[in-house]
């Protein structure tokens, strides 16, 4: 099993190109199931999760051609995918595929909308709390689907097709909004999605669906209106830049000191995180090429943050911020409101010498002067990169184990950090 070795202490200086957003690329790939024409997606990151979803879509009979990889390119490099779901041969998504990635459950929506039947295994992915699919099922039932759960599978059908409906989510749900949005595009009549997630990735998917002929209004607001159409056609769409990757590298620079240009980043996608970084002592400059992040000389200021749905501080940057705050001059407080059990990185950060106390949903971080390298183990995608951030600033050597979590969500991480002066290498086996 691969590991990453990091020797801390070096500042980061240079340029890091920001990849396409994983959290947009996955639902965009799934949306290709809605049409029998080809969907072309540019700026798709080369990630383990993307490769896994390609296998899942292939199981349904989807043809995917990857272009844009030249001889000598790294395995994980942005790509263009030509996705054709002209001939869907199977409407079952089996356990052995879906169990490896939670987002793959979303195939239930386009399969049901277009084929009127779907059988999808209950999902897998990061082990963060329960993350139930109840709200997704509720949305599909509102649209007229008949759903049962049998032997670990969700079995859904709508012989006459889906019908427009009023869907009101009891709480904001990104997954539920994606599923409702995709299903409603081919439903007969108009669908209203209330308490919808406002994340930029939702907007990106809606923009792509509209290019394919959907009639969606209000994406990015709490109320989305979808007027169903009979058919979607092919289109070409560029995946938006990854705001979580942007925030992660920005926090790494704030942690180590230095000056890095995050090329291609869009500040409006993570303004709340940039505001927190400014409060923590980083200098953020927006320019024509993206965002420049610097911290030279000054220490790290403590902050108090509560995670919230967009435009609030993203839960997917909570672990990275906690790593940064381990070196702050004072006590910081981070409250997690989105997912339960999302503090699994705390015990691993403690191995560096971090001082963190948990009280329910709130972590109090007592900043320390120095962190020391240690062998650590990744527990999930975002937690794993928080260990990398801590290791970059720690004295001595750190070995990060179980890095398959990193490969699920960060494209060419070692290369990007190494190019900016970090001592970091992947050790195979």
Curated annotation (Swiss-Prot):
It catalyses: phosphoenolpyruvate + UDP-N-acetyl-alpha-D-glucosamine = UDP-N-acetyl-3-O-(1-carboxyvinyl)-alpha-D-glucosamine + phosphate. GO terms for molecular function: UDP-N-acetylglucosamine 1-carboxyvinyltransferase activity. Pathway: Cell wall biogenesis; peptidoglycan biosynthesis. Keywords: Cell cycle, Cell division, Cell shape, Cell wall biogenesis/degradation, Cytoplasm, Peptidoglycan synthesis, Pyruvate, Transferase. Cell wall formation. Adds enolpyruvyl to UDP-N-acetylglucosamine. Signal peptide: none annotated. It comes from the Bacteria. GO terms for cellular component: cytoplasm. Phosphoenolpyruvate binds at residues 22-23. InterPro entries: Enolpyruvate_Tfrase_dom, Enolpyruvate_Tfrase_sf, MurA_subfamily, RNA3'P_cycl/enolpyr_Trfase_a/b, UDP_GlcNAc_COvinyl_MurA. UDP-N-acetyl-alpha-D-glucosamine binds at residues 102, 131-135, 316, 338. It holds the Pfam family EPSP_synthase. Disulfide bonds: none annotated. Its EC number is 2.5.1.7. GO terms for biological process: cell division; cell wall organization; peptidoglycan biosynthetic process; regulation of cell shape; UDP-N-acetylgalactosamine biosynthetic process. The modification 2-(S-cysteinyl)pyruvic acid O-phosphothioketal is found at residue 126. It is found in: Cytoplasm. This is UDP-N-acetylglucosamine 1-carboxyvinyltransferase. The active site is at 126 (proton donor). Belongs to the EPSP synthase family. MurA subfamily. It comes from Rhodopseudomonas palustris (strain BisA53).
């Amino acid at each position: 099993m691969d590991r990453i070795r990091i020797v801390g202490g070096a500042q980061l200086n240079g340029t890091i190109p920001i990849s396409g957003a994983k959290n947009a690329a996955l639902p965009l790939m799934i949306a290709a199931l809605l049409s029998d024409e080809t969907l072309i997606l540019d700026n798709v990151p080369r990630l383990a999760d993307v490769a896994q979803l390609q296998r899942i879509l292939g199981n349904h009979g989807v043809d995917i051609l990857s272009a844009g990889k030249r001889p000598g390119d790294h395995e994980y490099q942005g790509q263009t995918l030509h996705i054709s779901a002209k001939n869907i041969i199977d409407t079952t998504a089996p356990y052995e595929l879906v169990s490896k990635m939670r987002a793959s459950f979303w195939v239930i929506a386009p399969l049901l909308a277009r084929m009127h039947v779907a059988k999808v295994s209950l999902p897998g992915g990061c082990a963060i709390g329960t993350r139930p699919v109840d709200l997704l099922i509720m949305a599909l039932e509102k649209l007229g689907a008949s759903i049962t759960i049998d032997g670990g599978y969700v079995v859904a059908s709508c012989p006459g097709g889906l019908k427009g409906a009023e869907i009101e989510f009891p709480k904001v749900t990104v997954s539920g909004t994606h599923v409702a949005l995709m299903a409603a595009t081919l439903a007969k009549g108009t669908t209203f999605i209330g308490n919808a997630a406002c994340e930029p990735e939702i907007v990106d998917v809606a923009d792509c669906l509209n290019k394919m002929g959907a009639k969606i209004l209000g994406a990015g607001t709490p109320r989305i209106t979808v007027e169903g159409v009979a058919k979607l056609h092919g289109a070409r769409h560029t995946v938006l830049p990854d705001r979580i990757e942007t925030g992660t590298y920005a926090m790494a620079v704030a942690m180590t000191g230095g000056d890095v240009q995050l090329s291609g980043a869009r500040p409006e996608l993570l303004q709340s995180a940039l505001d927190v970084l400014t409060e923590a002592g980083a200098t953020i400059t927006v320019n024509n090429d993206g965002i420049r992040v610097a911290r030279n000389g000054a220490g790290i200021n403590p902050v108090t943050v509560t995670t919230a749905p967009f435009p609030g501080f993203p839960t997917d940057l909570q672990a990275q911020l906690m790593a940064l705050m381990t070196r702050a001059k004072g006590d910081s407080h981070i409250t997690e409101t989105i997912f339960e059990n999302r503090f699994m990185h705390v015990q691993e950060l403690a191995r560096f010498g971090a001082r963190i106390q948990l009280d329910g949903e709130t972590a109090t971080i007592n900043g320390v002067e120095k962190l020391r390298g240690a062998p650590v183990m990744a527990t999930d995608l975002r937690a794993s990169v928080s260990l990398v951030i801590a290791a970059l600033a720690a004295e001595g050597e750190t070995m990060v184990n179980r890095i398959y979590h990193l490969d699920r969500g960060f494209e060419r991480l070692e290369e990007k950090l190494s190019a900016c002066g970090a001592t970091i290498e992947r050790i195979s086996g």
